[in-house]
Regions:
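Short amphipathic helix-loop junctions that connect adjacent transmembrane helices
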Residues: 4-18, 196-212
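Helix-to-loop junctions at the C-terminal end of transmembrane segments
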Residues: 34-46, 130, 227-239, 323
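Helix-loop-helix hairpin linking two adjacent transmembrane segments in secondary transporters
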Residues: 110-159
Length: 351
């Protein structure tokens, strides 16, 4: 829901790509720092309390991001927004692993599919509101209202407990947990590129108006959602390793299409391929973490989430730096090469 705001923030504050990338780094730092804490808090107070508190903080940040013109306040708000998002992501995955294991069924892709559905509704909805001439601030107030209504409906069904606290709040990942974390790192980096730079790419390099730039992330989120909603059946049919291999190849091809064919239609097609390719890699990785015995679950889930989200921490800033000294196209192609590495890694992972 925040992706369509990026071009407005860039334009309102007169930021170049390098500065924007550094500011987006604040969001990643907030996420990274909150995740180990979220795992410990979920173990102590339960998933429900932490998910409710983190979502409320997100709702407080969104209207500020739509209006801020002060650089220090923008930095602080991005940090808090990132920390809140990190709390939601980590705790939701803790709950998902618990539920999947208790059910004895393959469910992780479906859970992540609903997360992606929120990306579609948020990005496309905000883009639609902005295209009607509604101000960014008013659009965010509408989003906040709808989010709080949904939270009130969902909260009673969230788990009042988390994973048992069998270890420290954070431990350096090792063995298969580290390997899974590195795969997640690359995929999250690619997702961060779509979230933070897809709109800028469309407006700066493909001549798309700012009010429609959010469609880039909406297309990415749409194919990711479809892939995940059907992902549990796909994983059962072809196996976890093939899902990672084929997904990495598809996502790499998508970034190449978006970058090398200089029309906005090709960019949207490329974003669609990236979403489809990345859709089930991370869910498969989280399921694998729930089955591994190298590290306690209460430590392993926050650990791979933290390593994975380091991709979002490093990715936007690195892409902004490369775009500043060279080009955004080169930055996207580097990410494509990294996704080829994910495909290779998928053949080595024991799931």
């Amino acid at each position: 829901m925040g992706a369509p705001l990026v071009p407005y923030v860039k334009q309102r504050m007169g930021l170049d790509e390098g500065t924007l990338g550094l500011l987006l780094l604040c969001l990643g730092v907030g996420s990274i720092l909150s995740m180990p804490l979220a795992g410990a808090l979920a173990a102590r107070f339960g998933c429900r309390r932490l998910l409710v508190c983190s979502t409320v903080l997100i709702c407080l940040c969104l209207p500020l991001l739509a209006t801020i013109s002060s650089l220090p306040l923008l930095i602080a708000t991005l940090f808090l927004f990132g920390a809140s998002m990190g709390g939601v992501d980590c705790t939701a995955n803790v709950q998902a692993v618990i539920v999947e294991r208790a059910s004895g069924k393959t469910m992780m892709s479906g859970f992540h599919g609903l997360f992606s559905l929120g990306g579609i509704v948020g990005a496309a909805g905000v883009a639609g509101l902005l295209s009607l001439g509604i101000s960014p601030f008013t659009a965010m107030l509408i989003v906040v209202f709808l989010t709080l209504v949904a939270l009130a409906k969902a909260a009673p069904n969230l788990l009042p407990y988390g994973s048992p606290a069998d270890g420290p709040a954070f431990a350096i990942p090792r063995g298969v947990v580290l390997f899974i974390g590195l795969l997640c790192f690359t995929v999250f980096l690619a997702e961060g590129a779509m979230l933070d730079w897809s709109a800028v790419f469309l407006t700066s390099l493909r001549g798309v108006e700012a009010s429609y730039a959010g469609l880039g992330y909406a297309v990415f989120a749409a194919t990711m959602t479809l892939g995940r909603l059907f992902g549990d059946a796909v994983v059962k049919r072809v196996g976890s390793n093939r899902v990672i291999i084929l997904g990495g190849l598809c996502a790499a091809a998508g970034l190449a299409v978006a970058t090398l064919i200089p029309v906005w239609q090709a960019a949207l097609l490329g974003y669609a391929l990236v979403g489809a390719g990345c859709s089930n890699i991370v869910p498969v990785c989280y399921s694998a973490v729930g089955r591994q015995k190298t590290m306690p679950e209460s430590v392993a889930i926050p650990a791979i989430t933290t390593v994975g989200y380091a991709g979002i921490l490093i990715g936007p800033a690195a892409i902004g730096f490369i775009a500043h000294v060279s080009s955004l196209e080169l930055a996207f192609m580097i990410v494509a090469v990294m996704l080829l590495g994910v495909a290779i890694g998928g053949s080595k992972l024991r799931t």
